[in-house]
Amino acid sequence: MNIETIITRAWQRKAAWLWLLLPVSWLYALLMVLRRQAYKVGILASYRAPIPVMVIGNITVGGSGKTPLIIALVRHLQQQGIKVGVISRGYGGDSSQMPALVTTESPPNVVGDEPCLIVNTTGTAMAVSPNRQQAIAILLEAYPDLQLIIADDGLQHYALQRDIEWVVVDAARGFGNKQLLPTGFLREPISRLKDANVIYHHKPDASSIYNKSDHNTLLTEHLTMHLQPDDLELLWSSNNQIDNLAVVAMAPEKGSQVHAVSGIGYPQRFFDTLNALGFEVIPHPYPDHYDFSLDELLQYADHPIIVTSKDAVKIRALIMQAIINQALSDEYKELVSRLWVLPVTAVLSDSCYESLQQQLQTLDIDISMRKQ
């Protein structure tokens, strides 16, 4: 078990020993303030792209629903006729092969799982690199007519100047003990929210969209979203037409036992969703961006296995590689027939689209009020 896993589990348990790390958090806070100010006053150089940049990020460690939000925004902008591209650092990919454009053929172990998911879902122009300036350069070289760039998870990357900032906050999870890393799971202080549009991610049936003790002094306008689960899909469909591997299976029924396997930032949300859908969930949380193996997944083959869309990207790549290597045994084929994906769609409030329209109009990008 690595140190990241130990601390993450301690956050979840609200372990008392975390307060021993408070001096480290104070030092981290000081460094964050100095770093941000250095970019503001020009001591550290920053880059302004030739077209507007919209940053989507969060101030907490772990998943907040950022990727589904980006997918929803890209789809909306595409349907309004806006030429939009996306950049990302490509976490989980191979930085030695970056900067790189992301296509539907890109392997997740090269460009990262989230970029693959975004491009496979939307078909948008996208580039990845830890150096955001290089990512923008290669993106605009390939797509010179882009009007807007969305930067995935670039909130703390102050080397990139931005025109719009949207921060996603998980209203149910909140901010824990409200301490910065490593005592708590905040990347930046809660006061950082004053400088950005805050999108409160809440449950569809939540009676309150946010924890007032955390947020009531910060905003006068609340933008909200929730994740709507779609129908279960076979992870590997017969449409792949590869090596005549046609998988036909019945979706697990409500009340049946399922293995929920998840390597995302906040897996509990995924488990809670499956429970709410009526499944008897056997949870298997893994670290974010975890690299699964087919052998590892075999241990769960006694029941249907349900994964997230992000994990499905990597698992499909494993299956494809096994087929190419002619290593897809009968045992693996049986496993493939038990693998299911639960896609989710980010549903945004009207105020999100209204705010987006207003912000883009100030950048001379015309967008209608029509929501998706």
UniProtKB/Swiss-Prot annotation:
EC number(s) given by UniProt: 2.7.1.130
An annotated GO BP: lipid A biosynthetic process
GO cellular component terms listed in the entry, alphabetical order: plasma membrane
Cystine bridges: none
Pathway where this protein functions: Glycolipid biosynthesis; lipid IV(A) biosynthesis; lipid IV(A) from (3R)-3-hydroxytetradecanoyl-[acyl-carrier-protein] and UDP-N-acetyl-alpha-D-glucosamine: step 6/6
Keyword annotations from UniProtKB, A to Z: ATP-binding, Kinase, Lipid A biosynthesis, Lipid biosynthesis, Lipid metabolism, Nucleotide-binding, Transferase
Top EC category: transferase
UniProt catalytic activity: a lipid A disaccharide + ATP = a lipid IVA + ADP + H(+)
A GO term for molecular function: ATP binding
Protein task: Transfers the gamma-phosphate of ATP to the 4'-position of a tetraacyldisaccharide 1-phosphate intermediate (termed DS-1-P) to form tetraacyldisaccharide 1,4'-bis-phosphate (lipid IVA).
NCBIfam families in the cross-refs: lpxK
Record family assignment: Belongs to the LpxK family.
Protein name: Tetraacyldisaccharide 4'-kinase
Organism of this sequence: Psychrobacter cryohalolentis (strain ATCC BAA-1226 / DSM 17306 / VKM B-2378 / K5)
Protein's gene: lpxK
